[in-house]
Amino acid sequence: MSTVVEVPVPGWNGWYARMDGSVRDPNNRIIWGSSNKLGHKCFYTKNPFGQYETCWVHRFVAMAFCPNPLPDVFTEVDHIDRDPTNNKPENLRWLTRALNQLNKKCKNCEWCRRKKRFRCFVTISGKRRNLGYFFTQEECSAVAFDFKLRELERIYMEILNAHHENTDG
């Protein structure tokens, strides 16, 4: 029989994070969490102040196992392998929001709660352009990729044309 290492979650009396990526609550129940639209595992419970809130399994595991050298700077927990279901401590690290966004599986996609779909967007010259709403991350990501590819081809052709105009004249 193998034993699972558990560590208390700081600030959450009676809560323990486990090496297998799960959490144990004060009633000794093992909590894996249910998946949100992006695959992150979450659960709903009372916080230490007695208010109900949505809690993220990966944050509990990171608080217990992954030292945060700069808590005021590194405010987000990143899944190194980009798999939001892999909440094992060796797959988690504390990052800034900007660094965490760089490691996203699906860039240029975000979940829109109001429309219950993924919003596809690109930023061009500092301006954000909405490309539409999609039911899956894959579809959203493909649209963003195609748009960027067309934009890259357009810019490439502009550069070539400008070069030819300068060398022909």
Ranges and model annotations:
Residues 166-167:
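C-terminal secondary-structure termini that scaffold catalytic or DNA-interacting sites
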Residues 1-76, 83-151, 155-163:
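Conserved recognition-core residues within compact binding domains
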